[in-house]
Curated annotation (Swiss-Prot):
Species assigned in the record: Vibrio vulnificus (strain YJ016)
Listed EC numbers: 2.7.1.30
Residues given in the record as sn-glycerol 3-phosphate binding sites: 14, 84-85, 136, 246
PROSITE patterns linked: FGGY_KINASES_1 (PS00933), FGGY_KINASES_2 (PS00445)
HAMAP family: Glycerol_kin (MF_00186)
Known regulation of activity: Inhibited by fructose 1,6-bisphosphate (FBP).
Binding locations of ATP: 14-16, 268, 311, 315, 412
Reactions accelerated catalytically: glycerol + ATP = sn-glycerol 3-phosphate + ADP + H(+)
Superkingdom, natural source: Bacteria
Protein name stated in the entry: Glycerol kinase
Length: 505
């Protein structure tokens, strides 16, 4: 029998699909990545092509194995981690999506949310799903598809349509339509799942007109869901045995499996999660109560704050403003000036997330004077990411009653030393960057490996979280407080736009 030497993590993100191959020591052996098309039909709308998502993800799996000559019979299991909330509805008979995937960033369902609020469902949603009533989550996206795609509602009521977040879609495709499943972490992001009873909420399905037959089966984040023979040379069937939404996978990859441990992922958005164990903490400060993974992949509760625009605001500097040619250049230009020269950039391009939850706020640059140059704007954009993180962390500490001694960080933007140092200064907290920053993939791999006995216990994994660098705060309290007050004023300017939305075309 061939020794199964590897675990593969499929990391399906907002802008790219990746496959990461790891060995038993959790070393990364091979990586493949492919970007895919971002579709913007109109202002505030964001879509992906589900078939392109699957095509890019499956090709990266083949490429990652092929780079190192790894056969499929050498792979013990596959774990999946994915962009959350992004919504796909497809016909189970044809296997084809009825519409593009509606991405988590998309704000088209703001009016549906207003209608649900007017019908008195806001507090019910908060109490039973742990979420706030916002276009961010999947439920209103499903309703929009059923209401706006010709024939969709009729087919749904006839039992022909299936709903899934991206993990569900990938597993369904990889098992040739045999398995329609999700895990607790992804289900908890739909605004359709009752986190008290751990089941789909029949009242919310009824209120949004979504047939229960569309919903996937919900399972733990670490168990065998099905098998696939996609990729690889030998055609051996490989177990798919780990699923977690990207942020919960990162939390697990950072080994934040006990109550009170927290991390921030700096990706397209920024996501701060704190594991609260078996205690459901209801936020008083605009945070989400959601589901994460306990030590064995069982559901545990967590607090989460989401910042919609993190790394995406650096992309904006590159792609729209043309101030930099590469995202890595932002650190160089930000350090060419000592301060932002009084400038604040609030990147509310698709509204504001936690703790504000203002769907109508818009991006704002304040404090401009004749002496402001491009370096100041670049620096202020990076500082805006750190300020938004403080907004969330302050709320999280108030809700949980826990003062963090350190924040664990991951994601692409943590390579930016200026951002990490400024983050530490703004928080007055140590920031720890791990040696292996691919913690989202690590989390998916750990969950998959534990399910098939590739790793025997959580204790075996605990020692793998080595720190690359710790950033210590250097800013004095007076300066920290003064600058943060300026940020709060800038946020109010961004929110003022919501009062003027009747002036938009």
């Amino acid at each position: 029998m061939t020794e199964q030497k590897y675990i593969v993590a499929l990391d399906q993100g907002t802008t790219s699909s990746r496959a990461v191959v790891l060995d038993h020591d959790a070393n990364i052996v091979s990586v493949s990545q492919r970007e895919f098309t971002q579709i913007y039909p109109q202002a505030g709308w964001v879509e992906h092509d589900p078939m392109e998502i699957y095509a890019t993800q499956s090709s990266t799996l083949v490429e990652a194995l092929g780079k190192k000559g790894i056969r499929s019979d050498q792979v013990a299991a596959i774990g999946i981690t994915n962009q959350r909330e992004t919504t796909i509805v497809w016909n189970k008979e044809t296997g084809k999506p009825v519409y593009n995937a509606i991405v988590w960033q998309c704000r088209r369902t703001a009016d549906i949310c207003e209608d649900l609020k007017a019908r008195g469902l806001e507090s019910y949603i908060r109490e039973n799903t742990g979420l706030v009533l916002d276009p961010y989550f999947s439920g209103t996206k499903v309703k929009w598809i059923l209401d706006n795609v010709e024939g969709a509602r009729e087919d749904a009521e006839a039992g022909k349509l299936l709903f899934g977040t991206v993990d569900t879609w990938l597993v369904w495709k990889m098992t040739q339509g045999r398995v329609h499943v999700t895990d607790y972490t992804n289900a908890s992001r739909t605004m359709l799942f009752n986190i008290n009873d751990l089941c789909w909420d029949s009242k919310l399905l009824e209120e949004m007109g979504i047939p229960a037959s569309m919903m996937p089966e919900v399972k733990r984040s670490s168990e065998i869901y099905g098998q696939t023979n996609i990729g690889g040379k030998g055609g051996t069937r490989i177990p798919i045995s780990g699923i977690a939404g990207d942020q919960q996978a990162a939390l697990y990859g950072q080994m934040c499996v006990e109550a009170g441990q927290a991390k921030n992922t700096y990706g397209t958005g920024c996501f701060l999660l704190m594991n609260t164990g078996q205690e459901k903490v209801t936020s008083r400060n605009g945070l989400l109560t959601t589901l994460a993974c306990g030590p064995k992949g069982e559901p545990a509760y967590a607090l989460e704050g989401a910042v919609f625009m993190g790394g995406a605001s650096i992309q904006w500097l590159r792609d729209e403003l043309k101030l930099i040619s590469d995202a890595h250049d932002s650190e160089y230009f930000a350090t060419k000036v000592d301060t932002s020269n009084g400038v604040y950039v609030v990147p509310a391009f698709t509204g504001l997330g936690a703790p504000y939850w203002d769907a109508y706020a818009r991006g704002t640059i304040v404090g401009l004077t004749r002496g402001v140059n491009s370096n100041h704007i670049i620096r202020a954009t990076l500082e805006g990411i750190a300020y938004q993180t403080r907004d969330v962390l302050d709320a999280m500490q108030a809700d949980s009653g826990i003062k963090l001694s350190a924040l664990r960080v991951d994601g692409g933007a943590v390579a930016n030393n200026f951002l990490m140092q400024f983050q530490s200064d703004v928080l007055d907290t140590e920031v720890h960057r791990p040696k292996v920053t691919e913690v989202t993939a690590l989390g998916a791999a750990y969950l998959a490996g534990l399910a098939v006995g590739y790793w025997n216990s959580i204790d075996e994994l605990q020692g793998k979280a080595e720190i690359d660098r710790s950033f210590l705060p250097h800013q004095d309290e007076e300066k920290r407080s003064r600058r943060y007050k300026g940020w709060k004023r800038a946020v109010k300017c961004a929110q003022t736009w919501s009062e003027l939305r009747d002036l938009e075309d």
